[in-house]
Design a protein with these regions (language model features):
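Glycine/proline-rich active-site loop of Rossmann-fold NAD(P)-dependent oxidoreductases
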Residues: 103, 116, 128-143, 153-154, ...
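N-terminal Rossmann/SDR dinucleotide-binding element
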Residues: 1-33, 37, 137
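Conserved Rossmann-fold NAD(P)-dependent oxidoreductase catalytic core, especially the SDR/UDP-sugar
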Residues: 29, 57-97
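NAD(P)H-binding glycine-rich loop region in Rossmannoid oxidoreductase-like domains
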Residues: 22-51, 62, 78
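Conserved catalytic-site region of short-chain dehydrogenase/reductase
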Residues: 38-39, 72-85, 97-103, 115, ...
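Glycine-rich NAD(P)-binding loop of the Rossmann-fold in SDR/ketoreductase-type enzymes
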Residues: 43-58, 92, 96, 100-103
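Active-site Tyr-X1-5-Lys
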Residues: 81, 93-121, 126, 149-151
Length: 207
C-alpha cells in the first residue's frame, strides 16, 4: 500500500526489487516488506514471524559488507497504547503481535548494523489512509469503512469509536519518507505522523 504509492509518486528515483530477490541494488535500501495487521494471531502466527523477521534477516544478510543505508519502515504502534504523544526517545511497549514483531525487527536491525558497520534509519509510521484497491477490515480500516458508507452499508465501531487516532494521507507519508531519505541523519529513529489526533467516530462522521 505505502510502498506501491511511493513507487508511483517517485518512479524515476526508485529501483523496484522483486519480492523474492534479497540483494540490494542501490545504496539506499527502503524496506517495506511486512504484514499489516494483528489478524494472523488468530489463524497462523508463523505469517508474522516469517514475513516480519525471517525474510527481513535474509535481506540483512545480503547487505553485509556493502556500503548502504538500510531504511526500515516500522510502526508507531511499537510504543504501545500511548502512541499519540510518543517521542522517538520514549520506551517501547508493543502490545499486539504485529507491533511486537516490528519492534523485534528494529532491535535486530540495530544490532546487526552495529555489528557489521551498516548505516540505518528507522521510520515509525502512524495510521495511514488513502486510495487502495485491496482495502479490508484488517488493512486500511478507515478506507474500508468509508467504502461501506459509500455503499450505504452499516458499520460496527468498536467501543462506539471513542478512541483517538492520528491519521496521515498516504501521499503525505510518502513525501515524509522521501524527506527522511534525503535529509535524515543516519542511525536515527524518525516518527512520521500528523501530530493531530481525532476521535475515530468523528472521522467516520466527517466522511
Amino acid at each position: 500500500f505505502i510502498g506501491g504509492t511511493f513507487c508511483e509518486m517517485f518512479p524515476e528515483e526508485v529501483v523496484l526489487v522483486p519480492r523474492n530477490n534479497r540483494e540490494p541494488e542501490t545504496n539506499e535500501v527502503l524496506y517495506f516488506i511486512s504484514t499489516t495487521t494483528n489478524q494472523s494471531v488468530f489463524s497462523n502466527l508463523h505469517i508474522d514471524i516469517d514475513t516480519n523477521l525471517s525474510i527481513f534477516v535474509d535481506v540483512l544478510e545480503k547487505c553485509k559488507n556493502k556500503d548502504i543505508t538500510f531504511n526500515f519502515i516500522s510502526s508507531i504502534f511499537v510504543y504501545g497504547n500511548d502512541i499519540l504523544n510518543a517521542k522517538e526517545t520514549d520506551c517501547c511497549n508493543p502490545r499486539g503481535f504485529y507491533s511486537i514483531t516490528k519492534r523485534c525487527a528494529e532491535q535486530l536491525l540495530v544490532s546487526y548494523c552495529e555489528t557489521f558497520g551498516i548505516k540505518y534509519r528507522i521510520l515509525r509510521i502512524s495510521n495511514v489512509y488513502g486510495l487502495d484497491k485491496t482495502v479490508s477490515s484488517g488493512k486500511n480500516v478507515l478506507g474500508y469503512m468509508i467504502g461501506l458508507l459509500k455503499e450505504n452499508k452499516d458499520i460496527n465501531l468498536y467501543g462506539g469509536g471513542k478512541f483517538l487516532k492520528d491519521y496521515m494521507f498516504v501521499d503525505d507519508v510518502c513525501r515524509a519518507i522521501r524527506v527522511v531519505l534525503e535529509k535524515g541523519n543516519q542511525n536515527e529513529i524518525y516518527n512520521i505522523a500528523s501530530g493531530t489526533s481525532m476521535l475515530f467516530v468523528d472521522i467516520i462522521q466527517r466522511a
